[in-house]
Amino acid sequence: MAKMKNPPHPGLMLKVMYLEPLGLNITETAEKLDMPRSALSEIVNAKRAISPEVAVKLEKAFPKHSASFWLRAQAGYALSRVNPHCADKVKPIKTSPLMESV
C-alpha cells in the first residue's frame, strides 16, 4: 500500500465528505453524535485526534465509513507527521526465531 505524503486530518475528511454536503453544523452534529460541541470542533479543525469511541459514533451516524476507516485515517495522518529521524539512535533488538515467524 502506497503511503500518502500528506494525508488530510480525518476531521477535514468528515467536514468535506459529510458536514458540508449535508449542510450540518458542528453543534447539531455533536448533538447527534452525543459528544461535546467543543470536542467535535477540535476534530474538524484538526486540533484533536479521532478516538476509537468517536470512530464508533461516526460509523453509526455515517454507515458508509466504518470505525476502522476513521482510525486508519487518523493513524495515517499521525504517522505522516512523525519526524523521520526520531528513531535514528534506535538499534534493532535481537528476538527469538519464533518471533520472526509471526
Swiss-Prot record:
Mind telling me which CDD domains this protein's record contains? Answer: HTH_XRE
Report the residue ranges that make up the HTH cro/C1-type domain in this protein: 14-69
DNA-binding stretch(es), residue numbering of this chain? 25-44
Could you list this entry's UniProt keywords, alphabetically sorted.
Answer: DNA-binding, Virulence
PROSITE patterns tied to this protein: HTH_CROC1
Q: Which Pfam families match?
A: HTH_3
| MF GO annotations | DNA binding
Task: Return the similarity comment.
Answer: Belongs to the VapA/VapI family.
Family annotation (NCBIfam families): antidote_HigA
Q: What is the name of this protein?
A: Virulence-associated protein A
| Organism ancestry | Bacteria, Pseudomonadati, Pseudomonadota, Gammaproteobacteria, Cardiobacteriales
The encoding gene is: vapA
